[in-house]
Amino acid sequence: MERTFAMIKPDGVRRGLTPEILARIARKGYRVVGLKQMVIARETAENHYGEHRERPFFGELVDFITGGPVVAIALEGENAIAGWRAMMGATNPANAAPGTIRADFATTTGENVTHGSDSAESAQRELALFFQEGELLA
């Protein structure tokens, strides 16, 4: 079984989308092995988005993700990384396939409701960044 990191971003939490997104996860058969609502510390956000540090939008990205509560989720299941990314849809909601979370709920590329690890390495790093040892179910 594969694990991945998923996040409902501040825009999704603010708009009350958490129950719908969790229901979609359950319908797909993924197991939630960790879940917590939190406000991300600036340092954590900077580490999380470290690959974008030199990009012009980095400051806006960090401000957005730390600007309200998020729901951090550890998912487990068959092909969880690719499967969750398929459920989310393209980063730009205009390019997201119908029926994906971003096509259904995202308003802009910046406020696109969800995040998901893009590789096994990213998943491992992001899970360790957001969950302490003992917080994930075996």
Curated annotation (Swiss-Prot):
Belongs to the NDK family. This is Nucleoside diphosphate kinase. Gene3D superfamilies: Nucleoside diphosphate kinase-like domain. PROSITE patterns: NDPK_LIKE. Its main location: cytoplasm. It comes from Deinococcus deserti (strain DSM 17065 / CIP 109153 / LMG 22923 / VCD115). GO terms for biological process: CTP biosynthetic process; GTP biosynthetic process; UTP biosynthetic process. It is found in: Cytoplasm.
